[in-house]
Amino acid sequence: MKKNIYLLFLFTSLYTVAQQKIPLTQPDSVQFMTEIVIKGFESDRRLLETPVSAGIVSRSDVQRFSTASLLPALNIVPGVRMEERSPGSYRLSIRGSLLRSPFGVRNVKVYWNDIPFTDAGGNTYFNLVDQHSIAQIEILKGPGGSLYGANTGGVIILHPEEPPFLQENISAEHHFRVQVNGGSYGLLDENAQWKYQDKNISSLLTQSHLQSDGYRQNTRVRRDVIQWNGSAHLSEKDKLDWILMYADMYYQTPGGLNMQQMQENPRQARPGTAFTPGAVEQKAAIYNKTPFAGISNRHNFNKNWSNITSVMLAYTDFKNPFITNFETRKETNLGLRTKMVYHAITGKQDLKFIAGMEWLHNYSAINNYGNQRGKADTIQFKDKIRARQVSPFVQGEWMMGKKFQLQAGIGSNFFIYRYRRLTDADDSKKKKKLDGQLLPRLAGLFLISENISLYASVSKGFSPPAIGEVRPSEGSFHRNLQPEYGWNREIGVRGRTLANRLQFDITAYRFRLNDAIVRRIDSADAEYFVNAGGTNQKGIETFAEYVLVQNTTAFIKSAKLRASITLNDFSFTDYMIDDKNYSGNDLTGVAKTIWAGGFDIATRWGLYLNTSFTHTSKLPLNDGNTFYAPSYNILLGRLGWKKQFNAFSVELFTGVDNALNQLYSLGNDVNAFGNRYYNPAPKRNYYGGLIVTL
C-alpha cells in the first residue's frame, strides 16, 4: 500500500511534466555517469571505457538528502549498503562484506585520492569523514587485490574538489560557504568552508560540527572536524596533494533489543538483566580523537614515465565504555604507497604499465578495564599489538584501437601480527604470520558502439582478520582465525541510449569465498569472530537514470528519474559449528532484494524537489536463519529553493526522512545472544537548513 502511494505520487509528477511542451534534451546538455572519469585501477578513463564494476556518488547526490549523513546517497548504489545502528555508528559493506563489521568498515580498502586511509589492521574510521569536503566517492566493487592489497569487498576512493590549474588568466580567488542544518531529535549540522584558488594552488579549509540527541535513549552524538586539503603544482613536472584532518567524535551506543522490546518501546536503550547492567547505567559510548595527515606527489619524468608516491600518518585515541568492560586503545598508523607508471600511445595502440608497492604499519596499545558506570576500574588486560602489511603489485593495460581494452594485473600481500600481553605471567611475544598470497585480476572491455560497452573480469580477493577480530573487545587473542579468500567472476554492460536520455549499468557476478569470517556475540554481549567455511555469492546489480527534461529556458528546467535494483543470492557452504550444519542457509545480514528509486525536478525559479524510495526485503539475523528482520519501505523527500545573486548564492531547504513512519532496524546486530538483533531507526523526522555561498 505504501509503495503504491509513492508510485501514485511519482506518476502524478510525471504526468505534470509530460503536459508541458518542452524541447527535447540535447545530447551535450547532460553530464552522464558513464562520462565521469574513473581513477580506480589506474584507468583515468570514462566509466564507459573502464572494465570494472563501479558506483559513483557525487556531491549533488549527497545534497539530494539531509547532508548530515552519507547514508542515503550511498545506499542508492546497487551492491552497496551503509547501516547506522545509532547516530555516528556506521557500517559500510560492498556485496555482503557487512558480515564482518560490528562497526566501521572492514574488508574494504579506503583511499583519499592515492593516500591510504585504511590502516594495517584492516580498519577504517569512516564515520570521521566530513562529507562536506568530498566532491566524489568512487566505489570499485569486487576484489581489488591486484592493485590495492588485502580486500575482498572492494575499494572506495574519496575525491576532493579539484578545480582546473595552470590557467594563466586566473587571478587569486577566495570563496566562502556556510551551511546550517537542523532537525528532529536535536539535530544540528554546521559547516563552514574557505576555498582558495589560483593558477597553481587549490586549497579547501573546512570546519564542521554535528550533534544530535538521537531517537533512542543513549544515542547522543557529537562530531567536530577541522580539515585542510588541497593540491599544488610545484613545477611543470610535480603536483602535490595533501590532507590534514583532526576529528573529535563522541557517540553513545544504546545496544540491541529483541523483537518484543522493540515493539513495546523502540526508543529504549538495551535494559539491564539479572546478569549484566544496561547501556544507560554503564554509560556505553565511543570516544575517538584522531589526527590524520597525508601527502601525495606526482612527478612526471617525461611524457611516458611518472611516479606517484603517497605517505600517511595517523594517531587515534579511542575509548569505549561498554556494558561489560572499558576498553582504551592508542593506535599509531603509518603508510607508504608508491608506483611507477609508463604510458605510451603509438598509432592505434595505447599501452600503460604500473608497478609499485604499499606498506602499512599499525601499533596498538589496548587496555581493558572493568566498567563502573562509565569509569575505568580494575585492569583486566594490557596488550600491545603490531600489524604490518606489504603489498607489491604490477598491472598492464592495453587499448587496441578504439574498441578493445585488456587489463591484467597481479598483486601479493604479506601480513604479520606481533602480540604481547603485559598482564600475563608469561608476557612473551606471540606472532601470527600469514603466507604470502598472489592476487591476480584479468579484465577486458569491448565497445559495442560509441555509447555502449561490454566488460568482464576475473579476480581473486584476500582479506586477513582485522585487529578487532584477532583481538576483539572481550580480550582473547584468536591466533587460529584464518584469512578469507575467494574468486570473483563478473560480466557487465553499460551505456546510454534513447537520444542520450537513458543511461544504464547492469552487472552479474559470482563470488565464492572460503574461510569466511563471521561475527558472533556471547552471553555477556561481547563479540568474537569465527571462520564459517565458505559462501557462494551470486548477484545482479542494475542502475538506470532517465532524463525527462533538461532545458534552462523552460519553467521546468530539469526532471530526472533514477532506479537501482540489487538481487542477492548469497548462501553458506561447508559451514558447521559443533553439530549444527548451516550449509545452504542464506548469508546472515544480507537482503535478497533491494530496490531504490528517485525522482528529481527543478524549475527556472529555483524551486526543486528530490524524492527517493527504497524497499528492502527481509534478511536473516543469525546463521541458522531462525530469525529474520521484516522487510521495510523508506520514503525520503527534500524541497528547496536556490537563488544566484551577483556576488553570492542562497539555498533554503526542508525535508523529511522515513515519511512512511516505518518501524525498522537500519543496523542489525547479527548472531546476537538473547535475540537482541534490533537497533530501531528514527520514525518520521524532519530537517531544514540554509546554505550561503560567496
Regions found by a protein language model. Give the residues of each.
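Extracytoplasmic beta-strand/coil segments of soluble accessory domains associated
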Residues: L71-I115
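Face-selective signature of the C-terminal outer-membrane beta-barrel domain
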Residues: E236-A247, K283-D424, I540, A544, ...
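Membrane-embedded beta-barrel scaffold of Gram-negative outer-membrane proteins
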Residues: N300, S306-M312, F318-K319, L447, ...
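C-terminal beta-signal and adjacent terminal beta-strands/loops
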Residues: Y509, A559, K618-P620, W641-L694
